[in-house]
Curated annotation (Swiss-Prot):
Gene: gltX
Position of sequence motif 'HIGH' region: 9-19
UniProt GO molecular function: ATP binding; glutamate-tRNA ligase activity; tRNA binding; zinc ion binding
Function, in words: Catalyzes the attachment of glutamate to tRNA(Glu) in a two-step reaction: glutamate is first activated by ATP to form Glu-AMP and then transferred to the acceptor end of tRNA(Glu).
Protein name in UniProt: Glutamate--tRNA ligase
Assembly: Monomer.
EC number: 6.1.1.17
Lineage summary: Bacteria, Pseudomonadati, Spirochaetota, Spirochaetia, Spirochaetales
UniProt-annotated binding residues for ATP: 254
Keywords: Aminoacyl-tRNA synthetase, ATP-binding, Cytoplasm, Ligase, Nucleotide-binding, Protein biosynthesis
Family from the record: Belongs to the class-I aminoacyl-tRNA synthetase family. Glutamate--tRNA ligase type 1 subfamily.
Subcellular location: Cytoplasm
Length: 506
């Protein structure tokens, strides 16, 4: 039997990082077993559906390199793979369950259902349908239909006994039928299927062998198993993945930080870092490494390595991964990755519409200008310096701004180190001007030794010597390595900035 899995998101928002993990685990399982990875669009929630969200889904998977074998715009032997185009199929199978006695017509209107909910809430009863229409006679059903009363189709959940299934991660599970949400709707009065009907029918017709989804769907699984049995179909192997939590133990949400893949991408996380980190959320690998490429993961992924406990999303750890992957980039690659952030930052002024038309470069649906030869030459010089300090691509602009703009002279209290007074700091800056020509052509280590010798001669720490120089040359506490920065900026410009700071602040 060939393994066949699916990622079946609802395009009701930008792709959540938790959804990305579900897609990734399904993709990796399929590739590790030589199987098929299907992309199915579950767009039956038309009030929240958006074409933008659907396109974002395709863009996200393509950017991450998670190529699907069937579904989406690609199509395939089970087309269509978009649920809103399969309504006739769902109606047919809903009717089949009614005809077999496993489902029934329900004519209760919204007012009655609201009253039931209020009574249940007042009496602290579990919510759910009271099965008022479950035992209507054929004559009663016909009479209501003849009157044109709208109806839904509900699943007839057994009143006694239990439903059992085996989860690949959680083991054998048994659910008392009396605890299953009573008689859920399968087909709405407008002909739209609910998730439960469409999901089961599509998984069967598309030959899905394994259903890997978040553990939040576990309570729905007994009902799905009941439906499989009612149809006479073999259920797939279920595998409910551990939840992705914030550091407070709550489900990951915007209050914890970025949650959509779009946000991570726009902040400047690399796809390699996202793939690597997300693949480790709730899963371990036998060789115990930190760094895995997508091709590595395709070979190593195994359901037996999944963890039952929830996975905590650690933003700092993801940032660490991002930094590691940035250091693996060549200078040319890093320039290509960072340039869109610089170009769109306004560092080189606003871009008018005519310039945009001539630009010819795209990034996240934004047009940006190509760099001038001079801009690229300067930035290529700084790439080796920033590579060790960047954690996010979006940090690049503030790191290189001093090379293209004259920074404002910082206030004296920001220039003066905590352990020095104003007079000593002034002497540091004067000494830096004096020895600046000596660092011409030196690398960071050799140039740093020139400054270290002066710091030692003054009886102060190296950091207390370098900080005032860095602040006056770059205007910031954070910059590429100082000696290299001065070499790129030019010693004359660096001296002028220090002289200006002395004149204005000391």
């Amino acid at each position: 039997m060939q393994v066949k899995v699916r990622y079946a998101p609802s395009p009701t928002g930008f792709q959540h990082i938790g959804g990305v993990r579900t897609a990734l685990f399904n993709y990796l399982f399929a590739r590790s077993k030589g199987g098929k990875f299907v992309l199915r669009i579950e767009d039956t929630d038309r009030t929240r559906y958006s074409e933008e969200y659907e396109q974002n889904l395709y863009d996200t998977l393509e950017w991450l390199g998670l190529e699907w074998d069937e579904g989406g715009p690609k199509g395939g032997p089970c087309a269509p793979y978009i649920q809103s185009q399969r309504f006739d199929i769902y109606r047919k199978y809903a009717q089949e369950l009614v005809d077999k006695g496993f489902a029934y017509y329900c004519f209760c209107d919204s007012e009655r259902l609201d009253r039931i909910r209020k009574i249940q809430t007042m009496n602290k009863m579990p919510p759910g349908y009271d099965r008022a229409c479950r035992n209507l006679t054929d004559e009663e059903i016909k009479a209501k239909m003849d009157e044109g009363i709208p109806y839904v189709i509900r699943l007839k959940v057994p009143l006694e006994g239990s439903t059992k299934f085996t989860d690949a991660l959680l083991g054998d599970i048994e659910w008392k039928n009396e605890d299953i949400n009573p008689d859920q709707i399968l087909l709405k009065s407008d002909g739209f299927p609910t998730y439960h009907l469409a999901n089961i029918v599509d998984d069967h017709l598309m030959g899905i062998t394994h259903v890997m989804r978040a553990q939040e769907w576990l309570p729905s699984t007994p009902m799905h198993v009941i439906m499989y049995k009612a149809f006479g179909w073999e259920p797939p192997q279920f595998c409910h993945l551990p939840m992705v939590m914030g550091n407070d133990g709550q489900k990951l949400s915007k209050r914890h930080g970025a949650t959509s893949c779009n946000e991570f991408r726009n902040k400047g996380y690399l796809k390699e870092a996202i793939i690597n980190y997300v693949a480790m959320l709730g899963c371990s690998y036998e060789d115990g490494r930190d760094m895995y490429s997508l091709s590595d993961l395709e070979k190593l992924f195994d359901i037996k390595h999944l963890n039952k406990a929830p996975a905590v999303f650690d933003y700092k750890k993801l940032e660490w991964f991002n930094g590691q992957y940035m250091r693996e980039k060549t200078d040319e690659e890093l320039f290509a990755l960072t340039w869109p952030y610089i170009a769109n930052s306004g560092l080189f002024g606003k871009i008018n519409e005519e310039e945009l038309k001539k630009a010819g470069c795209r990034f996240e649906n934004q047009t940006y200008l190509k760099p001038t030869q001079e801009q690229k030459e300067i930035l290529m010089k700084v790439m080796p310096l920033v590579k060790e300090r960047l954690h996010l691509l979006s940090e690049i602009t503030e790191m290189v701004r001093f090379l293209f703009e004259e920074p404002a002279v910082p206030p004296a209290e920001e220039i003066i180190p905590k352990k020095l007074d104003a007079e000593t700091t002034k002497k540091v800056l004067q000494k830096a001007i004096e020895v600046m020509p000596k660092i011409l052509g030196l690398d960071d280590h050799a140039g740093g030794e020139v400054f270290r010798a002066e710091a030692d001669a003054m009886g102060i720490k190296m950091g207390d010597f370098m900080m005032p120089v860095r602040m006056t040359v770059t205007g910031s506490r954070i910059s590429p390595p100082l000696v290299g920065s001065i070499q790129i900026l030019g010693i004359e410009k660096a001296i002028k900035r220090i002289e200006k700071a002395i004149a204005e602040r000391f």
